[in-house]
Amino acid sequence: MNCRVAALLEKLRVQECTKSRPRRSNDNALAESKNGTVIRKHFGYGHIPGRQAERLHAFHRDVLAPHLNYHRPCYFPSEQVDARGRVRKRYRQQDIMTPCQKLRSLPGAADCLRPGIDFAQLDALAGACSDNEAARRLNQVRDKLFATIRAEQAGAA
């Protein structure tokens, strides 16, 4: 084996073991970053007993997911290729939108929706309350949920 082949193999080996690779989302890093920035922000880092899982799932499904999808703006990157051919991600002010707005902006997005769902229904969900009202509701329901969990844990102890 010559030096060039050895260098290529070494480069491949390092890429397979590295977890923080740009534009590679096929490993667990994407899920863990979501847990850190979205889930843990609202649920906290403390232990939550398994018997509370159904309540937390209902909160996530009925309150948190609609808030994130229809009312929380996100930056979406624009890719620009520089003179050397490297792809640069740029986060511009005009690229801020909710995930629902981003879905609508994609070509052929209507074909990706579930059967029986159209953008008029999604707009009705998004327009049911303002962004501030949705955030207020999220905080109220979350506080009530965790007060119930704390009361049950105190009663069980």
Identify the meaning behind each predicted range.
Residues 1-26, 30-108, 112-121, 127, ...:
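Charged alpha-helix within mobile-element recombinases
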Residues 125-157:
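C-terminal non-catalytic accessory extensions
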